[in-house]
Amino acid sequence: MDIDPYKEFGASVELLSFLPSDFFPSVRDLLDTSAALYREALESPEHCSPHHTALRQAILCWGELMTLATWVGNNLQDPASRDQVVNYVNTNMGLKIRQLLWFHISCLTFGRQTVLEYLVSFGVWIRTPPPYRPPNAPILSTLPETTVVRRRDRGRSPRRRTPSPRRRRSQSPRRRRSQSRESQC
């Protein structure tokens, strides 16, 4: 059975595979970040969002994996076999957990659409031959500045330059709408 944990979020394992393994912070850093930013929502009995649920599951999964690794470390007598198991867990399972944690923390922090646009942008950048691409890779934290403009225009007709003669202009300055985030529980 081929299960893609990102499918319901509009991404895929393949899309995340464009990011190099050293791109993702350590599991410890990601766990600390999720606790610092989302502890209340993660510990709440309330359902907040699918990203909170997936993040909870990834954290629980990592805890179980560490319990198993500790058991193996304490019960496997052959040092070579023990090292093989530890290396496999750190290399393969560790990377998968780091990807999952990063994806869901990023979606909660920046918004799912921004993260998906970043993954596509990075994928295009990394596959473009070096002589033809900009020297620096896209940066996730700078994407909202450029994507907000595109989002605002979707589904709307172009704004008129002159006010309609039937409507009077308000004397109060226009308030800028704050962008709602998926991360609010």
Curated annotation (Swiss-Prot):
- Its protein name is Capsid protein
Description of how the protein assembles with itself and partners: Homodimerizes, then multimerizes. Interacts with cytosol exposed regions of viral L glycoprotein present in the reticulum-to-Golgi compartment. Interacts with human FLNB. Phosphorylated form interacts with host importin alpha; this interaction depends on the exposure of the NLS, which itself depends upon genome maturation and/or phosphorylation of the capsid protein. Interacts with host NUP153.
Annotated region Disordered: where?
Answer: 135-185
* Family that this chain belongs to: Belongs to the orthohepadnavirus core antigen family.
SUPFAM superfamilies reported for this sequence: Hepatitis B viral capsid (hbcag)
Q: Name one GO biological process term.
A: viral penetration into host nucleus
Q: Where is this region: 3 X 8 AA repeats of S-P-R-R-R-[PR]-S-Q?
A: 157-179
Annotated GO MF terms: DNA binding; RNA binding; structural molecule activity
**Motif window: Bipartite nuclear localization signal:** 160-177
Q: Where is the composition biased (Basic residues)?
A: 149-178
Q: List residues modified as Phosphoserine.
A: 157, 164, 172
A single GO cellular-component term from the record reads:
host cell cytoplasm
What does the UniProt entry say about where the protein is found?
A: Virion; Host cytoplasm
Is DNA-binding tagged as a keyword? yes
Q: What does this protein do?
A: Self assembles to form an icosahedral capsid. Most capsids appear to be large particles with an icosahedral symmetry of T=4 and consist of 240 copies of capsid protein, though a fraction forms smaller T=3 particles consisting of 180 capsid proteins. Entering capsids are transported along microtubules to the nucleus. Phosphorylation of the capsid is thought to induce exposure of nuclear localization signal in the C-terminal portion of the capsid protein that allows binding to the nuclear pore complex via the importin (karyopherin-) alpha and beta.
- Keywords, comma-separated and alphabetical: Capsid protein, Cytoplasmic inwards viral transport, DNA-binding, Host cytoplasm, Host-virus interaction, Microtubular inwards viral transport, Phosphoprotein, Repeat, RNA-binding, T=4 icosahedral capsid protein, Viral penetration into host nucleus, Virion, Virus entry into host cell
What does the record say about PTM? Phosphorylated by host SRPK1, SRPK2, and maybe protein kinase C or GAPDH. Phosphorylation is critical for pregenomic RNA packaging. Protein kinase C phosphorylation is stimulated by HBx protein and may play a role in transport of the viral genome to the nucleus at the late step during the viral replication cycle.
Q: Which domain of life is it from?
A: Viruses
Q: Note the segments forming the sequence repeats.
A: 157-163, 164-171, 172-179
Q: Which Pfam families match?
A: Hepatitis_core
Q: Where is this region: RNA binding?
A: 179-185
Q: Does the keyword Disulfide bond apply?
A: no
